[in-house]
Amino acid sequence: MNRPVGTPNFDGSFVVPAEVDTDDVDNFELGWKTTLLDNQLRFNGAAFFIDISDLQTTIFDPSIVNLFFSDNAADAEVIGVEGDITYAPEAFQGLTINGAFSILDSEITEVLTPTGDVVEGDELAFAPTFQGNLRARYEWDVKSNALGEDLVGHIQPSIVYSSASNSDILQFNTDRVQGYTQVGLALGVSSDNWSGEIYANNLFNSSGELSRAFGNDRQRVTPVRPRTIGARVAYNFR
């Protein structure tokens, strides 16, 4: 129930509704799972179309009322493809490459709230056009240690990327969420019972943002974690 129910905008073309309708989402998806190159390559994925009707949102528009209210603001569509890949080449024993990606094309197709706060053709909030990650792990045998255990060493570089996106569908609330690229590196050794690893996440200390939100006249930003260097040790008490 909206507290400022019945409040009109300046020309009377819009009145804050007493309640909002349930938004509806229809999702159509075609997926696949494949194994190629004599089981060296696995590629799974899906293509999808999402039809959103009566998208709910919370609006703060001082030209109408100095209170937040909810409304069915727009209809929208999302077309996308996502997938994950694992490649373990026989010609390079010990190497495994993993990756995943997401491609989105989102759009406001019809504006339902005649206040000018939502614009047809804009993308949806927090819907980056492309996101992806890639990780390569190489393992090799290490000579037995003083306890007579056979050890396995590994090195694992990785990269994560996200393009920029909008923080809201409302014009006066929205801001651009900064995209980012992060590189990581890990080096370690393991046996049947224990493992140890040193790692560096966001190796080059790149900037970026996970989210933005507007509240109390301020943009509140959640940044990506800065460069983090650490060590992990695990033991299996079996």
PLM region spans:
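Extracellular loop and loop/strand-boundary signature of outer-membrane beta-barrel proteins
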Residues: S13-E19, N66-N72, T115-L124, I169-T174, ...
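Transmembrane beta-barrel architecture of outer-membrane proteins
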Residues: V25-E29, Q40, A76-D84, A127-N133, ...
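C-terminal beta-signal and adjacent terminal beta-strands/loops
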Residues: D51, V160-D168, G188-R238
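Gram-negative outer-membrane beta-barrel transporters
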Residues: F49-D51, D71-N166, R232-R238
